[in-house]
Amino acid sequence: MTEADSLQEISMPESAEGMRFDSALALELGISRSAVEDIFESGDCIWAVDGEEVKKSDRVKVGDKIRVLLRSKESHTVESARLPVIFEDSDIVVVAKAIGYAAHPSPGWSGPTVIGALKESGVQIAHVGSEEREGIVHRLDVGTSGLMVVAKSERAYTSLKDQFRSREVKKIYHALAQGHLDPAVGTIDAPIDRHPKEDHRFAVVASGKPSVTHYEAIEFFPAVTLARIELETGRTHQIRVHFNAIKHPLVGDLVYGADPRLAERLAMKRPWLHAMELDFRHPTTGERVHFSAPYPPDLEESLASLRRSIGG
């Protein structure tokens, strides 16, 4: 173990009970299937109690605690991969964030970041905002794919922060929710704050911050609904919390009540959630600009699997 390696102790969530450890760990850490494979092949996942190796085919039980060694070389390999750039000029860069990337460095996170990947690919980010969050005006969860805009100039940073604060930015997501949404078009208006008992989760709490999510069903499948979602506010985990609150958790979202058997059947290693569209005023021209990003392969394949099951 080097100074750059990170040893993390993880209490497996109750919702992961019965899943294989490789599937559950990919969801919990928000990393790729190949990265999880490397962890188990290297013997870097052990039981917290006795230090014995965890086998990837072992099944999660309630109360399981493990220790996982995340090696710096693995993080560097992922960091060096280019994120698809959708648009770039002197003020902004719009990227399609892959899963497994945090927006910026933070305590306890040793994996790749959007800022790190952009810098390694030669994108010049102005020193705006706090040092570790330079250029970041909004975030996506590690396990969420899709569009992010990053400010390259002070002018862009100020303009975009103001637009997000005043809710001028239009943010459209696609999500696969368990069950059939009824009504098919609706609004979830429920305040969100940290979960009163579990620090890593958020919940609908009466004293929380106002949070509004609009949704519309796009396509119904047996037992699940593909939905288009527009955020009026932008709280941490907002879509995941709101859909869990209405008893329609996102497929693959074990932290917020998803069925692990369905996640495994659709090979979902993370919540089925994608930031599909972004629309905002360009910081220099003042004109509205619109961007979209296609589904990544894991989401495409899960939909294809659902359609094959219908077609027989």
Question: Can you say where each PLM-predicted feature lies in the sequence?
Answer:
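Short, surface-exposed secondary-structure edge patches
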Residues: 55-59, 228, 270
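RNA substrate-recognition surfaces in RNA-acting enzymes
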Residues: 251-283
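Conserved hydrophobic positions within beta-strands
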Residues: 85, 177, 214-217, 250
